[in-house]
């Protein structure tokens, strides 16, 4: 017969765990909202930067512009910037992006190219260090909601690698935020920069809302407002120098957006994982309660049988 006290203790333990997972789900939801607000807040700056870059690019389209950050050279070595999380309890978020980066490294090796990692997040750092992979720099303990200062710091390292010609191309491996239950590890080239297509680039802004007591994400496509600068605009500096100065800022802005997307993906994965854990805890509590009631009923029945048996023995 199951021990009633052990079942009761287990029910209480599962209830306490459910409180923790539910609290973690709500905290993750609050942070997703903060990430959403940050994306919206940085959008005007990103729009204006794209407009100026497109304007300068249009103004200089007939000139022979030789800028280091735009120059494509023969690729012999590739830097892989991998963005993961510092913590677990977020489903397959870390595993998926690490696997994508590892597969890309194998592809580069098969092509006869050297590679090195720049890591963001403790999980990816631990994984690749255990496998003795080349790591040029790592960044851990970043804010839950990425900041521009953090993006600038990482961008400086990437610029140093590229301009010193230690690597000829830098690729970014991060998790693109799709929805609360879906995210996708993707790869894009960061350096050399490609400013083509700025005038037609669309972007998406996500909003976390509630409907019927459930969290959901609404996505809004925003069309870029980039357009040529006025023909009569006079520059105090050489337009080439201005473009050269703005390109690192453009890189930092791209990197900040990738950090924001990755953070939102991690938080959404944690929300989903904790929601599933809470549901499983609820089901386990029901099952344990049923077992407890059956065991209690069996114990009462046994006691009654013993009482009846004792009474019959006395008569």
From Swiss-Prot:
Q: Which domain of life is it from?
A: Bacteria
Which Gene3D superfamilies does this chain map to?
3.40.1380.10, ATP synthase, gamma subunit, helix hairpin domain
* Matching NCBIfam families: ATPsyn_F1gamma (TIGR01146), PRK05621.1-2 (NF004145)
PANTHER family, alphabetized: ATP SYNTHASE GAMMA CHAIN, ATP SYNTHASE GAMMA CHAIN, CHLOROPLASTIC
UniProt subcellular location? Cellular thylakoid membrane
| Family statement | Belongs to the ATPase gamma chain family.
A GO CC term assigned to this protein in UniProt: plasma membrane-derived thylakoid membrane
**Function (record text):** Produces ATP from ADP in the presence of a proton gradient across the membrane. The gamma chain is believed to be important in regulating ATPase activity and the flow of protons through the CF(0) complex.
Name this polypeptide is given? ATP synthase gamma chain
Q: Quick one: where is this thing mainly located?
A: membrane
Keywords for the protein's UniProt record, in alphabetical order: ATP synthesis, CF(1), Hydrogen ion transport, Ion transport, Membrane, Thylakoid, Transport
Q: How does it assemble?
A: F-type ATPases have 2 components, CF(1) - the catalytic core - and CF(0) - the membrane proton channel. CF(1) has five subunits: alpha(3), beta(3), gamma(1), delta(1), epsilon(1). CF(0) has three main subunits: a, b and c.
Q: Which GO terms describe its molecular function?
A: ATP binding; proton-transporting ATP synthase activity, rotational mechanism
Q: How does it sit in the membrane?
A: Peripheral membrane protein
């Amino acid at each position: 017969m199951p021990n009633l006290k052990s079942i009761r203790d287990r029910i209480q333990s599962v209830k306490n765990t459910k409180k923790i997972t539910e609290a973690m789900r709500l905290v993750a939801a609050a942070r997703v909202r903060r990430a959403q607000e940050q994306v919206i807040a940085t959008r005007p700056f990103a729009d204006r930067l794209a407009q100026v870059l497109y304007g300068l690019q249009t103004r200089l389209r007939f000139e022979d512009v030789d800028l280091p950050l735009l120059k494509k050279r023969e690729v012999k070595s590739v830097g892989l910037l991998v963005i993961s999380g510092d913590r677990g309890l977020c489903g397959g978020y870390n595993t998926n992006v690490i696997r994508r980066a590892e597969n890309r490294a194998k592809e580069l090796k098969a092509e006869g190219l050297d590679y090195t990692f720049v890591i963001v997040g403790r999980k990816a750092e631990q994984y690749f260090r255990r496998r003795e992979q080349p790591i040029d720099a790592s960044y851990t303990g970043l804010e839950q909601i990425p900041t521009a200062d953090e993006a600038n710091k990482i961008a400086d390292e990437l610029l140093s690698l590229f301009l010193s010609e230690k690597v000829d191309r830098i690729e970014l491996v991060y998790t693109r935020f799709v929805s609360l239950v879906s995210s996708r590890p993707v790869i894009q080239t960061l350096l050399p920069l490609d400013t083509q297509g700025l005038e037609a680039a669309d972007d998406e802004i996500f909003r976390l809302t509630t409907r019927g007591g459930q969290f959901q994400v609404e996505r809004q496509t925003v069309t870029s407002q980039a357009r040529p600068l006025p023909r009569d605009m006079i520059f105090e500096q050489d337009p080439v120098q201005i473009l050269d100065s703005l390109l690192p800022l453009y890189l930092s802005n791209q990197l900040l957006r990738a950090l924001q997307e990755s953070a939102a993906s991690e938080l959404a994965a944690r929300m989903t994982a904790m929601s599933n854990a809470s549901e499983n805890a609820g089901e386990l509590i029901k099952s344990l309660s049923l077992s407890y009631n059956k065991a209690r009923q069996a114990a009462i029945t046994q006691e009654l049988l013993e009482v009846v048996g004792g009474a019959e023995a006395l008569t």
